[in-house]
Amino acid sequence: MTARRKRPFVLVVEDDASLGEVVVQAFRDEGLDARLARDGDEAMRVVDELAPAAIVLDLMMPRRDGFSVLRELRSDGRIARIPVVVVTAIFGLSERMYATELGAADYVTKPFELDDLVSRVRALVASHKAA
């Protein structure tokens, strides 16, 4: 992790490109830096390279799901404290509990309000920065 940024950087991990770009643009519109990763492997490369202040993580992705990404994030001491907001169409209590056990800071179900997501991520970034 080498990058230093003036504005907080949010990594959006979403395999649906159109939704991902809308979310990225919402963060940019609110003065945050944001980038889209389309799968879990790309997400881990970006995390290692750019050190995001927060991650918005879809659970249901091809090849490597969000649970796997979350497990890897939490197992690496260099990046284990990055706040992760899980965003998913999965409404089940067991999935929500599992994501929380793996270290998700928040869990948002689709469809969601962009303003609400941005607000939640901003709050996590601020509290993480203060810690």
Regions flagged by a language model, labelled:
Residues 20, 61-63, 80, 92:
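The feature encodes the CheY-like receiver
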Residues 16-35, 124:
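Two-component/phosphorelay signaling modules centered on CheY-like receiver
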Residues 24, 68, 91-108:
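Alpha4 helix (beta4-alpha4-beta5 surface) of REC/receiver domains from two-component response regulators
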Residues 112-122:
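C-terminal output helix
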Residues 45, 67-80:
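Short amphipathic alpha-helix used as the core "switch/output" element in two-component signaling
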Residues 39-42, 53, 65-71, 91, ...:
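Acidic catalytic/metal-coordinating carboxylates
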Residues 50-56:
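Active-site beta3 strand of CheY-like receiver
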